[in-house]
Amino acid sequence: MENISRLKFFERNGFKMTNPYWAWSGVNKDKKLVMFNVWEHFKEKDNGKLRYIVLCDAWEHATDSSKGFNDSLKNINLVINDDYKLCIAIAEPTVKFAMPVAKEDEEVKIKHIKSSFYFISDVVKENGIYWGYPVKRVNV
């Protein structure tokens, strides 16, 4: 598996991030796709289906990057309201941290992106959490 940055992974797959320093997601307007990176350990089974946390309302005030949250909220709304498809790329953290909101003293940092694939996913909002349910693997 090639170890590349999140920005390089997004660009290589046609997704433009608003700002590579604080953006958590990117958009491919031509293909009507939105890509989010999701944490590898922010997942659970729901009636036998794997799902990942894509975005959480609690993150708005749990991070020093409200720009990143607002940008991601705008992008998830493209999926919900404007017929864009959700894509998720799996990010492995340097260390696992609390779910869905990291504790104040926990490091939240990407070790690497799983760069050989991403998933096209359905999205469901439940109790303030946007869940991505992978439906199709896209090898890249």
Task: Report each predicted region and the residues it spans.
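Short helix-coil boundary/hinge micro-motifs
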Residues: 1-140
